[in-house]
UniProtKB/Swiss-Prot annotation:
Annotated gene: infB
Region annotation G1: where it falls in the sequence: 110-117
Predominant cellular place of this UniProt entry's protein: cytoplasm
Family statement: Belongs to the TRAFAC class translation factor GTPase superfamily. Classic translation factor GTPase family. IF-2 subfamily.
Region of interest (G4), ranges: 210-213
Start and end residues of each stretch annotated as G2: 135-139
Name this protein carries in UniProt: Translation initiation factor IF-2
Length: 593
């Protein structure tokens, strides 16, 4: 048992002060058990009594861990980090020109049917260095090719979801984007979406006009359509290299790779291979045989076998590394993609990964990262002025969606005129129709917000926006829309109050307590229910009462929260009229960012 009891003594003694156990804002079950000098199974049992299911690697919040510690007769104290552990390991900033060149990192984007995958296969089959591993390949989400003695790293990510996830967490993994457009189909909506993401990333774009073997191929039409979208090819006076290709016939592949090397030379891409490694997670999964596996793109330094690394809210020691063809390697230099084993848990795509000196330093960094809410770098109308004042941003990126084309241009023009000497307003995407998941992804990637005028939002888009804390504003009066943005850049916009549903529970039985109060025996349906939360009781879809909860119990124990799938007893202040099948919504209110 985790709880400790003291035997009665014949003599009255002054109890010694309780041992103080310092914990981070988040702690794993194993770490908590080690701190208590007890078996992790006992901690798991104690959590179960509180309605929390956990395994040995589960991370729990400080308040939950505190209850376990106090039940064991100790005092819990939140460990406060005096200095950012991340800052201690940040590589020294030196002139990049002193460092050796590194391979460029390239992402291929475009419409799903325009030959993007076949183009990747053509590049891989003609140039990939497969012979090192006897032809045995392993998909790790990235691979390297070599042309004229120079390496190029390709990120083989589906769509632009991973691309967006990396940028949404502040990780810039790509140096160059290849935009693939089919010469017969021309520019499609998904092409424009990919172009928006590439522009938002601020990286050079190479145009691959694919399917040139088709009799109906019309490359000039592609160039014209892209020019109308703001991407002008070199031969028309712009900055974009356009390479005709045929993935089917493997034509134009070498020319495309040479274009990549040309851009890389102009960009002068360099990195220091002699510092502690840092990079970004580009794929991550739980391998049923080998445990947590992360594919990492090393961006600076050299990652070595045995290194202790931190990625977001997890850490580990590099037990094994594999290159893009499945060969075990002992080190990985800048721009090298590797699959590594040894993480405590699965990191998130887009997490920055960094090598540290000690396990203690790794734990401190994980603790610090756990104290920071994992949200995107998106701003909101409410906080944009503060962000500008602090020097965090110099641009306000907006995705604008309207009901009709006639509304789009005047709103767009009005917003762009609100730019000041301190902040520039960019309309990253404008279009007609509902707000889509792609719009939210672009807002995530660009650190922007979304404005809808007389238009709706798709369910998946709303769900993603809620999860990633993307600010979406809806208007049906143009002057109000423009006025709010103007006030926002001047710091005059009042914050709005929003309601957040924490969890829902259904009443399954009603009990009378000894104090003549009714207690609702409930099953938590979703989320989590909290003691002292505001609760809305719904009966037949109608609100019967809105009151604070004053009692939350599991069996005979008072608890602070109960999660979905567990039963609990709930009491509401000054309310006794519970009925079976009533729905209880637990919620809180907070200011929008």
């Amino acid at each position: 048992m985790v709880e400790k009891t003291s035997k009665s003594s014949a003599k009255t003694e002054v109890a010694p002060p309780a041992k103080v156990i310092e914990l981070g804002a988040a702690v794993s079950v194993k770490e908590l058990a080690d701190s208590l000098d007890t078996n992790p199974v006992e901690v798991i049992k104690a959590l179960m009594r509180k309605g929390i299911m956990a395994n040995i690697n589960q991370v729990i919040e400080f308040e939950v861990a505190k209850g376990i510690v106090e039940a064991a007769g100790f005092e819990a104290r939140l460990k406060v980090l005096k200095k950012s552990a991340a800052k201690k390991v940040s590589p020294a900033k030196e002139k990049l020109s002193n460092f050796p060149l590194r391979p460029p990192v390239v992402t291929i984007m475009g419409h799903v049917d325009h030959g993007k995958t076949r183009l990747l296969d053509a590049i891989r089959s003609t140039n990939v260095m497969e012979k090192e591993a006897g032809g045995i390949t392993q998909h790790i989400g990235a691979y390297q090719v070599e042309i004229k003695g120079q390496k190029i790293t390709f990120l083989d990510t589906p769509g632009h979801e991973a691309f967006t996830a990396m940028r949404a967490r502040g990780a810039q993994a790509t140096d160059i984007t290849i935009l693939v457009v089919a010469a017969d189909d021309g520019v499609m909506p998904q092409t424009l979406e990919a172009l928006d993401h590439a522009k938002a990333a601020g990286v050079p774009i190479i145009l691959a006009i694919n399917k040139m073997d088709k009799p109906e191929a019309n490359p000039d039409r592609v160039k014209q359509q892209l020019a109308e979208a703001g991407l002008v090819v070199e031969e028309w006076g712009g900055d974009t290299l356009a390479i005709p290709t045929s993935a089917r016939e493997k034509k134009g592949i070498n020319e495309l790779l040479e274009a990549v090397l040309l851009i890389a030379e102009l960009e002068d891409l360099r990195a220091d291979p002699n510092q502690p490694a840092s990079g970004v997670v580009i794929e991550a999964e739980m391998d049923k045989n080998r445990g947590p596996m992360a594919t990492v793109l090393v961006q600076s330094g050299t990652l070595k076998l045995g290194d202790t690394v931190v990625a977001g809210t997890t850490w580990g020691r590099v037990k094994a590394m594999f290159n893009d063809v499945g060969k075990r390697i002992k080190k990985a230099e800048p721009s090298t993609p590797v699959a590594l084993l040894g993480m405590e848990s699965v990191p998130q795509v887009g997490d920055k990964i960094i090598a540290v000196a000690t396990e203690k330093q790794a734990r401190d960094m994980v603790n610090e990262n756990s104290q920071v809410t994992r949200k995107t770098n998106a701003v909101s109308l409410t906080n944009v002025y503060d962000q500008v004042s602090k020097g965090n941003i110099k641009e306000l990126n907006i995705i604008l969606k309207t009901d009709v084309q006639g509304s789009l241009e005047p709103i767009k023009d009005s917003l762009e005129k609100l730019s000041t000497d301190k902040i520039k307003i960019n309309i990253n995407r404008s279009g007609v129709g509902n707000i889509t998941e792609s719009d939210v992804m672009l807002a995530m990637a660009s650190g922007g917000l979304i404005i809808g005028f007389s238009t709706g939002i798709e369910t998946n888009a709303q769900r993603l926006a809620d999860a990633e804390d993307i600010d979406i504003r809806h208007y049906d009066i143009i002057y109000k829309l423009v006025e709010d943005v103007e006030k926002a850049v001047q710091g005059l916009l009042e914050p709005t109050i929003k309601e957040v549903i924490d969890g829902r529970a259904e009443v399954r039985a009603v009990f009378e307590s000894t104090k003549k109060l009714s207690i609702a025996g409930c099953m938590v349906l979703e989320g989590k229910v909290l003691k002292n939360s505001q609760v809305r009781l719904l009966r037949g879809g109608e609100v019967i009462v809105d009151a604070p909860s004053n009692s939350l119990r599991r069996f005979k124990d008072d608890v602070k929260e109960v999660v979905a799938g567990y039963e609990c007893g709930v009491g509401l202040k000054d309310f006794n009229d519970f009925q079976k099948s009533d729905i209880l919504e637990f919620y809180h209110k907070e200011k929008s960012r």
